Amino acid sequence: QVQVLDLFAGTGNISYEFASRGAKQVTAIDQNRHCIQFIQKTALELEMNITAIQAETLPFLSQQKTSYDLIFADPPYDFEFDVYTQMTELTASLLNPKGILIIEHDKHIDLSRIKGFTENRNYGNNVFSFFSF
């Protein structure tokens, strides 16, 4: 019964993964119209419960009222530190109790100073930082 929000979804690989593992609902957000159309088409073909929305992430988060069990974000690696901070602040109010935020980022960025940080997991040049609030 997990509700997932996939931010900066791109072509939807993470969304498909969560949907294939039994997530009740996956919402994919990306600002690129072609990516959203691709996700919609693929989700329909694979009969997956994925809602794809074309939107800029930070404005979307600031207007969002739905709550989620898991939020995954794979933002551009050139984000400034304060944008990561703003993103975690906006997602904190959208997580259900015991909900988790996961941010994928470059290994040269240290997000451990951001409120809610719990751990890092390293995968080559990529790091997944976990947050709970």
Set out the residue ranges of the language-model regions.
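Class I S-adenosyl-L-methionine-dependent methyltransferase catalytic core
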Residues: 1-133
